[in-house]
Amino acid sequence: LSNPPFGTPWKTDLKAWGIGKKDEISDSRFIINYDDNSEYSLIPDIGDPQMLFLANNISKMKTTTELGSRIIEVHNGSSLFTGKPGSGPSNLRRYIFEQDLCEAIIAISENMFYNTGIGTYLWVLTNKKDEKRKGKVQLIDATSMKEPLRKNLGDKNCEMTQKMREKVMELYLAFDKADSEYSKVFLNEEFGFYQVEVNQPLRLRVNVSDEALEEFKNSVKDDEFYDFLMTNEKDTESTNFNSFIGKLEKSAKKAGLKWTKKRENAIRKYFTTTDENADVVLDKKGNIEPDNNLKDTEQVPLLYDGGITGFFENEVKPYVEDAWINEDSAVIGYELSFTKYFYKPVQLRDLSDIIADIRAIEQSTDGLLASIIGGEV
């Protein structure tokens, strides 16, 4: 059982280890060999030690006994989702779910603690799951199970009664047969996703205008190349960057100029603009160059039918035909949201009740204007 501090920086702990930065940590509790990565980091942000406590406890779980080990830790909501894919917090969640360590996560009401009003979550972990729980996680929403205190204790204004605690235990023990209003069971992979990079082709229009030439002259200080452009390319326009560069390189060499990467980059910087109607730009190997300004990321659920390819065909290609996914960029992340699974929409009032209220207001204000101006309306 553990109740780690919320949002307390652990810089002083680094000093106790004799370490200056968290990137220098090599402790096997927090840097493990996993997923073909000998330096797989479970280290959270320096401002919140909750998941550091969790990783530490996981490293101490017994594997040689019949019952193994069981961990219950109280965390705030950030442990459910903080950290991008590949970061320490996301890696720890991934490790927990992929190693099938999480039995349940229980959401508790706000204002249960003396010094904080935020909602909290109980992480229930074990390395010896019952057969029926293997490969699955139970989420229990106990946020409505509270009774107000007669007198507040700091931020604490409510508590869970004995009957409420028994109700949570009943839900936990019932597992997949529990009341679905309060309990839901999912496959571990439900909370995992691929974060992938979606690219669109770079399209450049060339325009060797007077303004661009003047900016080039003042910024680059390459008089030889400037004179060449003024003489040979002034007012040139093209929607095919590769064709323009190819011809420019040949004519520059023919004129005795050295063609360099610096000069080619200068052409891009000062004489091109992106244009969706221009031709696609290709690199030296003939590959389509991506437009960094149009680069986007998508989260593809691990359980998405057809995987990354299926997601692209269904969710991206119909809207951006020339886009492509860089599958080498795929990083696995894990996060979850209780709101997503236990969302309860606000019950709207019946229209007849609203109309009745409006009519009542009209009646109560009848004659008000007349009394104000001293006459009848």
Show where each model-derived region lies.
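Residue-level recognition of alpha-helical coiled-coils
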Residues: A370, G374-V377
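A conserved structural/catalytic subdomain of Rossmann-like adenosyl-cofactor enzymes
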Residues: L1-A370
